């Protein structure tokens, strides 16, 4: 197995039902486990545990400052020709989160000794990914599905930051929370 990636994120509360919105998506896509749903603050990559811990500690003072959020629309993420993920963009809380993510992300990346992000923050929650090494027969059905797909009606309070890495058994859950 390659070196695990690390990231800091705002986990969706355990009572959130946002994963239900992806149930009717084309079956060729892999659905995230409800406990894996999060809003990424800083992707640290394979930086190692010590550097990830430094990033986590740098963000500790901000741990409870996130706003309430609501889903706004579905979006394909990654390259337009072959998206790498599908998720929900945020409506309520989006502007405040863009500001917070820009600041928090910069603090975390610097503390971990990682390069600064070149992309502006895009507050979203990823729910679906294509299965690896597949051609894209699901792209057109997915575009049609997103045009009419349900949105979660429940607003959520993102209550705390968490440090994530890969799950030890990725067959069920992709990630595990370290802190």
Model-derived features: positions:
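Histidine-dependent nucleotide/RNA phosphoesterase domain, centered on the 2H-phosphoesterase fold
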Residues: 1-179
């Amino acid at each position: 197995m390659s070196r695990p990636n690390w990231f800091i994120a705002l986990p969706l509360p355990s009572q959130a039902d946002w994963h239900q919105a992806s149930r009717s998506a084309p079956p060729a896509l892999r659905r995230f486990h409800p406990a894996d749903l999060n809003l990424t603050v800083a992707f640290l990559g394979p930086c190692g545990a010590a550097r990830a811990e430094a990033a986590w500690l740098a963000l500790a003072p901000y741990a409870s400052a996130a706003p309430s959020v609501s889903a706004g629309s579905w979006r394909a993420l990654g390259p337009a020709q072959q998206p790498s993920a599908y998720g929900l963009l945020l409506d309520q809380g989006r502007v405040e989160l863009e500001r917070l993510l820009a600041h928090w992300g910069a603090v975390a990346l610097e503390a971990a000794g990682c390069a600064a992000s070149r992309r502006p923050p895009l507050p979203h929650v990823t729910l679906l990914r294509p299965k690896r090494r597949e051609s894209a027969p699901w792209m057109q059905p997915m575009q049609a599905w997103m045009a009419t797909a349900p949105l979660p009606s429940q607003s959520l309070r993102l209550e705390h930051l968490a440090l994530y890495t890969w799950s030890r058994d990725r067959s069920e859950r992709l990630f595990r929370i370290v802190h």
